[in-house]
Amino acid sequence: MGSTMEPPGGGYLHLGAVTSPVGTARVLQLVFGCTTFSLVAHRGGFSGVQGTFCVAAWGFCFALSVLVVACEFTRLHGCLRLSWGNFTAAFAMLATLLSATAAVIYPLYFTRLECPPEPEGCTARNFRLAASVFAGLLFLAYATEVALTRARPGQVASYMATVSGLLKIVQAFVACIIFGALVHDSRYGRYVATQWCVAVYSLCFLATVVVVILSVLGHTGGLGCPFDRMVVVYTFLAVLLYLSAAVIWPVFCFDPKYGEPGRPPDCPRGSCPWDSQLVVATFTYVNLLLYVADLAYSQRIRFVPTF
């Protein structure tokens, strides 16, 4: 099942879940997450897609953090049909990315040093500044957990706690950014070549998600072939696919024969296809580098297969 029952004779409550370094980081996550969410909901305020994303990210991270701390403290994680080490490592990395994004977006769109006009006034400004500070602290709390639980070189660990496993979460997150730019009037349907790039992004994203799900559910040991070898082969193919997209997408979007080499002067901000194409191109190279790093690290990892 991928989970491990606690040995008999131990207490029902595990105090180390809140007193250990990792436990302390998780308690701080709850404190900072609840404070940030409360400040924004009470007087800070939010609006639009950006504000909704921030609140959703904080709410999601807080809810799962409560689940993790509760299961660790009561030892109920041993009853779950999943690999607990893989689950907590994957969630900590995802929460780090989400909280980092929200910690950048909220101050950028909602925080100003000058007081807004009434009825909001300086009170709303102060709440937004405080929420921005606690959002940054929340990111640091999740990043601390990732640093504390990451597998060290030569250490036998769950796959998602290795650098390769953590990179899988980052790759999927970057792919979501690419998808967001694609659907925002990127005009990817004009050429078969750019449609091929979309297929590459989708295929690699789905394969990465499958690897993460298999690890979290604890089914990496019954695939008929070694899981680490399968991951290396997939990562190598992903590097080749992303390499093709890294060449094709800029050519068909920014070459004068097919697209615009520079941003059109009459292109409106916030709804300019060229901007979306630039975002896709930039994060294509980011993900290519992530897959190359993943391939390099996956050559030397050792992790515990789960059944």
From Swiss-Prot:
Primary location: membrane
Limits of the MARVEL domain: 17-154, 159-303
Q: Where in the cell is it found?
A: Membrane
Enumerate the UniProt keywords alphabetically.
Membrane, Repeat, Transmembrane, Transmembrane helix
The GO cellular component terms are: membrane
Transmembrane ranges?
A: 53-73, 90-110, 129-149, 163-183, 198-218, 232-252, 278-298
Checking Pfam families in the record gives: MARVEL (PF01284)
Q: What PROSITE patterns does the record point to?
A: MARVEL (PS51225)
Topology class, membrane: Multi-pass membrane protein
Enumerate the PANTHER family for this protein.
MYELOID-ASSOCIATED DIFFERENTIATION MARKER MYADM FAMILY MEMBER, MYELOID-ASSOCIATED DIFFERENTIATION MARKER-LIKE PROTEIN 2
Q: Which family does it belong to?
A: Belongs to the MAL family.
Protein name per UniProt: Myeloid-associated differentiation marker-like protein 2
Q: Which organism is it from?
A: Bos taurus (Bovine)
Q: What is the lineage of its organism?
A: Eukaryota, Metazoa, Chordata, Craniata, Vertebrata
